[in-house]
Each structure stands twice: as structure tokens, then as C-alpha cells.
Regions:
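Conserved pre-ATP/AMP-binding loop-to-beta segment of ANL
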Residues: 43-44, 160-177, 184, 207-213
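Conserved AMP-binding/adenylate-forming
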Residues: 54, 69-114, 427
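Conserved AMP-binding A3 loop
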Residues: 55-59, 173-197
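AMP-binding/adenylate-forming catalytic core of the ANL superfamily
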Residues: 131, 263, 318, 368, ...
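Conserved AMP-binding/adenylation subdomain of ANL enzymes
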Residues: 196-213, 221-262, 276
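Gly/Ser/Thr-rich phosphate-binding loop
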Residues: 260-265, 274-336, 349, 356
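AMP-binding/adenylate-forming catalytic domain of the ANL superfamily
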Residues: 491-513
Length: 526
């Protein structure tokens, strides 16, 4: 990491970083270097093609990044500056990220769906010197207390400068945020090499090659979106297809049109695709691999999607902060693919914590809150905010889940540390409730949250979006019918919903995850 900046992180020591380089987990190659290599090796290949029909070959991408870098330098960008980017997913955002890197500056990535309150909080926390927006967000940015340029203004700027020196692979290159399912986000600090390690693992697990065609449908600035739309396509030299905003129909159409081989999505998006008639109307047979993660994967829609497309669904378990702890591979069985988060990754050391204080090592029991050290982790939160919560006392980075690890090293998520419904003194896993509820054919997406109860303290409330088959039929679903279905399947009575709320669309965070914080407020349990 940069020697002149104290990022205040216990994530790894200098000796550990040297080891990661020595064994090849980390690289001396930057993303900017990889773009230049692609411009030579795959000059005429499409690098990015977006929903507007705009696209750049790798040679054009490299040239565009250089042109934007000199204009950034002309606008005053200097090495070490923090440049915020509030921009829709398109070819332009990836060119801009590389141009900022070539100026030696640091990207502050902001989700396109973020509101001005969230943007203002990220700008203040990151101390960004400049905000660059697309035209759609430029007017909203006018009231923010930072110098602002639209991407069009930057591209048209006449003043040029000399950029650089560009960042190295161990330098901080990006600051993004937690995806904000509860409260305002915290800023997470990233080096390129943590994502280079993740990239190598994805290539091995999915048997990826430069000939693959990627379709990442997670917002670019967030962890899952970052490696699937930016770092891995660039390091591979493959083509990435970009959508402005996810819909099931648009995704299926893009797969068919571009003969996509690698789809990258959170499990909610995959479930929505299966519930949409578009998944049967378009030819999805080109798909070979689906990378998913971020939330528990419902078995039924996942198995149906594999049967429909012939693709294999691979899961990663981890977070924006920790990177990957476990993953499935093409060699795993169907049950391992769809029932677990995969086997613990050999290069990542993982321990389980529990006990009354949550700080007791309970790894031998096979169940607890995971924490890790290794080459995939971020540096944690900017300025060490909440590091006492993120890290254990001896420097292991925590996940916010409760997990089980079996004798073969496969990890399963049983719920979040804060995602339990405490009914009459019994902890009920919201993830287990959701997985059970999702077996009903009328339900496309479900989210379980606690609701207040004078007798039991909390009861199980489930919010659902209906599948297309339900909307074209009766158009609704009654609690009694859902409970009857679950009992017929033998679902434990403690997992039965006690309130069912059907809504058109579940609220989602900037990162695309279901915003349970909002649902808890709606249910009267904030």
C-alpha cells in the first residue's frame, strides 16, 4: 500500500503482503497495464458494449482512457486525490475508472441508485476533491458541497495536463461503501491486488477464458459488481455487456442477443429471472456459468434455472469488506452447488467466533460467526471507523453472518447475526424462512423480518413479490394458502409466517440487495 498514507488497517502485515506476492496470489500488474496489454493482444475485440448500443474495442478503450486522463489532469487531478464517481453503469464509467488510476488518483465509487443524502455522506466521509456524474445525476449533484463535473463536460474540456504517476497494484485505488441495507453506508478501502486474487480464483473455479462474454448485472462500484464488471473482464481481456438497470426481460434479451456465456447476479435477480416469462421466451443456451452471491440462494429457482439453460451456478461467500471465504467450483456436486456457499478457500484462513461475548473461538464446534485473514480482504473501513466491530482483537475481519462448516469444509449460511427473529426466546433464521417460502410457485421474491408482538416479543412477517404466474391468475396469495403449502412440504412450524404482505416491489439498497431496514420500519420493528 502507499507508503505515505496511513490507512490504519490491521488486515495484513508487511510480511504477509510479501508472502502473497511471493506465492503469486498478488501481482505486479495493474488494471491500467492490463488494458494496454489488451489493446495489443485483442485490439479489435469489444471491451464493453452497453445498453445504449455504445461500445469500445480494447484499443479504443485504451485510447479513451488516456484522453480522459489528460483532461482530468487538466482539471486539477493529482496523485492521491479522491475523485468521486456517481454514474450509471455504462462503458464510460469503466473508462473513467482507468483514467483516474492513470492520474494516480483514487476512485470513490457511488452507486447509481444512491440518493443525495447517501451521496453527501460518502463525499464527506471520503473527503473527495471532485465529483464526476453522468448527465442524469448532474442536476442533483449541484447542491452537494464539492466541485462537480459531468462526464460530458470533462470529455469536452480543452485544458490538458500531464497525468500520473499511475497507481501500483498494492496502492489504494478505490473507496466504495457498504451497500447500505441498514442506515447510512461506511466507506471501504480497496487495493487492486485483493481483487486480482479474487479474479484468479474466479478464473479457476469457472474455467474462464478471454473468449467468454460477461453480463454483470450488479452495480459497478460495489464489491460483487466491481470484480465481475471491471477487474476480471479487464484482466481476462474478455467482452462485457452492460445494462443500465436490471430487469429480468432486459437481462434475458441481452443474453440471447450477445450470446453471453457468464452471467453475474445476486440471487434475488436470478430468482426474478426464473419467475419472468422472458426466461422461457429467449434463448439462454449460450450460458455456461452463473456467478451468484450476496444473499442465500433459494434451491428451487436455482435448480430450475440450471435445467432450463444448462449453465452451472457457482456461489461465492464473502462481502465487500472480506472478499471471498468460500466458493463452489464446476467439480462440485449439484447439492454442493446449490445448498452451500462452497468450500473454504485454501488461501484464506477462517475461524468461527461465538460465546456470550461473541469473541470466543468456537471453530471446533463448526458453527459461529466467521472471521478471516488472507489475500482477498480489503483494508477495512476508511479512517478505521468501526474497526473494533469489524475486526477481532487480534486482527481477523468479521462477517455479519452465522455459518456452519461441515467436516469437508463446506460452508452454509444459517442467518445474519442481526437477521434472526426472536420469537418467545427462540432464534428463528430469516434466511430459512425465506428459503421455505420461496418454494411456493406463486412467489418470486421473499423477505422475512420481525414484527412486534405483546406475547412473543416478535413474530414472523414475510413480504413477497408475486411471480408472473400468480399475477396472470388470481393476482394474490393468502397467508392460509401459503401455510398450507409449507405444512404439506413438512416445513417446521417455527418457520411458518404469521403475517404475509404482498407488494409490487421490495425495497432495495443501492447495491441491489433487499433493504430489510426499511421493511423492519414498515412492520413496526426498526
Amino acid at each position: 500500500m502507499s507508503s505515505d498514507t496511513d490507512w490504519n488497517s490491521p488486515a495484513y502485515t508487511a510480511a504477509e503482503a510479501a508472502h502473497y506476492h511471493a506465492v503469486g496470489w498478488w501481482s505486479l500488474t495493474t488494471l491500467s497495464d492490463a488494458v494496454r496489454r489488451n489493446a495489443q493482444r485483442f485490439s479489435a475485440r469489444d471491451a464493453y458494449v452497453d445498453y445504449l448500443g455504445a461500445g469500445l474495442t480494447w484499443q479504443e478503450f485504451d485510447t479513451a482512457a488516456d484522453a480522459l486522463a489528460v483532461r482530468l489532469a487538466g482539471a486539477g487531478a493529482r496523485p492521491g486525490d479522491r475523485i468521486a464517481v456517481w454514474h450509471r453503469d455504462s462503458t464510460a464509467i469503466h473508462v473513467l475508472f482507468v483514467a483516474i488510476e492513470r492520474c494516480g488518483a483514487i476512485v470513490v465509487g457511488i452507486g447509481a441508485r444512491a440518493g443525495t443524502r447517501e451521496v453527501a455522506a460518502i463525499l464527506a466521509a471520503s473527503q473527495a476533491q471532485l465529483l464526476i456524474t453522468d448527465e442524469q445525476r448532474h442536476a442533483a449533484a449541484a447542491g452537494l458541497e464539492v466541485a462537480t463535473l459531468s462526464i460530458d463536460e470533462l470529455q469536452a474540456a480543452a485544458e490538458m495536463g500531464v497525468p500520473g504517476p499511475q497507481l501500483g497494484p498494492d496502492d489504494v485505488f478505490l473507496i466504495n461503501s457498504t451497500s447500505g441495507t441498514t442506515g447510512l453506508p461506511k466507506c471501504v478501502v480497496h487495493t487492486q491486488n485483493r481483487w486480482h486474487y479474487f479474479h484468479q480464483l474466479a478464473v479457476a473455479n469457472g474455467e474462464l477464458s478471454p473468449d467468454d462474454v460477461f453480463l454483470p448485472i450488479i452495480p459497478t462500484p460495489f464489491g460483487f459488481g466491481l470484480w465481475t464488471s471491471h477487474t476480471t473482464p479487464i484482466h481476462l481481456g474478455t467482452t462485457a455487456i452492460l445494462l443500465d438497470r436490471f430487469t429480468a426481460a432486459a437481462t434475458c434479451a441481452a443474453i440471447a442477443r450477445h450470446r453471453v456465456t457468464v452471467l453475474c447476479c445476486v440471487s434475488t435477480q436470478l430468482t426474478m429471472m426464473m419467475a419472468d416469462p422472458a426466461s422461457r421466451e429467449f434463448d439462454l443456451s449460450s450460458l455456461r456459468v452463473v456467478f451468484t452471491g450476496g444473499e442465500a440462494l433459494p434451491y428451487r429457482p436455482a435448480a430450475e434455472f440450471e435445467e432450463l439453460t444448462g449453465a452451472k451456478i457457482l456461489q461465492f461467500y464473502g462481502s465487500n469488506e472480506t472478499g471471498v471465504l468460500s466458493a463452489t467450483t464446476l467439480d462440485d456436486s449439484l447439492e454442493r452447488w446449490l445448498r452451500t456457499g462452497g468450500r473454504i478457500v485454501g488461501e484464506m484462513a477462517v475461524r468461527l467466533f461465538g460465546g456470550e461475548d461473541g469473541n470466543t473461538d468456537v471453530t471446533e464446534t463448526g458453527r459461529g460467526q466467521p472471521a478471516c485473514r488472507g489475500p482477498a480482504t480489503s483494508l477495512g473501513y476508511l479512517n478505521g471507523v468501526d474497526h473494533d466491530k469489524l475486526f477481532t482483537a487480534d486482527g481477523w475481519m468479521r462477517m455479519g453472518d452465522i455459518c456452519e462448516i461441515d467436516a469437508d469444509g463446506y460452508l452454509s449460511v444459517t442467518g445474519r447475526t442481526s437477521d434472526f427473529i426472536l420469537r418467545g426466546g427462540k432464534n428463528i433464521s430469516a434466511a430459512q424462512v425465506e428459503d421455505a417460502v420461496m418454494t411456493h410457485p406463486a412467489i418470486a421474491v421473499a423477505a422475512a423480518v420481525p414484527m412486534r408482538d405483546e406475547v412473543f416479543g416478535e413474530k414472523v412477517c414475510v413480504y413477497v413479490e408475486l411471480a408472473e404466474v400468480a399475477l396472470t391468475g388470481a393476482g394474490t396469495l393468502e397467508l392460509a394458502d401459503l401455510v398450507e403449502h409449507l405444512l404439506a412440504l413438512g416445513v417446521s412450524k417455527e418457520l411458518l409466517p404469521e403475517r404475509l404482505v404482498v407488494i409490487d416491489e421490495l425495497p432495495r439498497s443501492s447495491g441491489g440487495k433487499i433493504a430489510k431496514g426499511q421493511l423492519r420500519q414498515i412492520s413496526g420493528h426498526s
